[in-house]
Each structure stands twice: as C-alpha cells, then as structure tokens.
Amino acid sequence: MRQHRQFMDRTHYLLTFSSSETLLRLLLRIVDRAPKGRTFGDVLQPAKPEYRVGEVAEVIFVGANPKNSVQNQTHQTFLTVEKYEATSTSWQIVCNDASWETRFYWHKGLLGLSNATVEWHIPDTAQPGIYRIRYFGHNRKQDILKPAVILSFEGTSPAFEVVTI
C-alpha cells in the first residue's frame, strides 16, 4: 500500500493525495471560461443577412469543451438549423448535427476560452425563407477544492434569409 502525503492549502483544507500526479491533474484541470462581458452561447460572428442555395452559412459562438456534453442529456444535439414558419409562427428544425449539410468545429483557446463554429452547407433542396442556427453545449465550472459542476447553455444566431438563384 502506498503511503499518502498530506497537503494543506491556503484555505486550511486538509487534502490527501496518493501521488503528486493526482495533485498535478487536479491543478491542471482547466474550466471553461467566457470572454469578459460575454456568456456561453453568445454570437461572436453572426451569419450574413442573406444566402443563396449552395452557399455556406457560418456562425461563431462563445463555446465550451464538447466533452462536457458527454454525460449530459439536456440537449440531444450540438446544433440545429431552424426555419421560420409564418403559418404556425414558430421555428421548425430542418437539420441538426447528424445531417450531412452541417459541420461543428470546436476551437480550443487559451486558459479555458474557446469558440464553436457552426456551418450549414445550404442544399439545393432548401426552401427559400427565414432561418437561424442554434448551438447547444455544456460548460464546466469548478471552484477550488469543490467538485466540478456542468451547466447547460444555448445560443441562437440572428435570423438570415435563404433565397433561390
């Protein structure tokens, strides 16, 4: 049996670790952070106001590590593309991250900051109309010496129009 080392932190909590590697792993865990003045899911780069069939709509959001969503079932997808239906005055999902027309890219930054880029390669079959892109994720928050908390968030792009050629 390995001998345990005891460490005292500045807040006077007694911690017991079986190895220095465990302490290092605890200290190196980086939580997700949003840029100052922003929250997770905020749009950093909106879509253009208008696209034609065959073009790529792209939106960049304040993101978080996608690994945080593995154990959480709040949302069943990282993204949706939705079309506004005037007759029902509601948004209808036309595709998600399982669709061939969509792409999701996570860009890891420094010190827990990251972005998520969502692309929709607008297919020839897309109906003209008003669309938006939504992003769903989970951010990891952890205070020193406390267990991590996983929080869900979502972001929605401003509406944009798809027109036919």
From Swiss-Prot:
Q: Which family does it belong to?
A: Belongs to the neutral ceramidase family.
Q: Which domain of life is it from?
A: Eukaryota
Q: What does the entry list under GO cellular component?
A: membrane
Tissue specificity annotation: Ubiquitous. Expression is reduced with increasing age and in late-onset Alzheimer disease (LOAD) patients. This reduction is even more pronounced in patients with an affected mother.
Q: Name one Pfam family in it.
A: Ceramidse_alk_C
Q: Which InterPro entries match?
A: Ceramidase_alk, NCDase_C_sf, NEUT/ALK_ceramidase_C
Q: Identify this protein by name.
A: Putative inactive neutral ceramidase B
Naturally occurring in which organism (per UniProt): Homo sapiens (Human)
Q: What else is known?
A: ASAH2B/ASAH2L is a partial paralog of ASAH2, resulting from a partial duplication of ASAH2 on chromosome 10. It has a polymorphic start codon with a single nucleotide change of the original ASAH2 sequence plus other putative translation start site that might lead to several potential ORFs.
For this chain, one GO molecular function annotation is: N-acylsphingosine amidohydrolase activity
Task: Give the UniProt record's GO annotations in the biological process aspect.
Answer: ceramide catabolic process
Q: Which residues form a coiled coil?
A: none
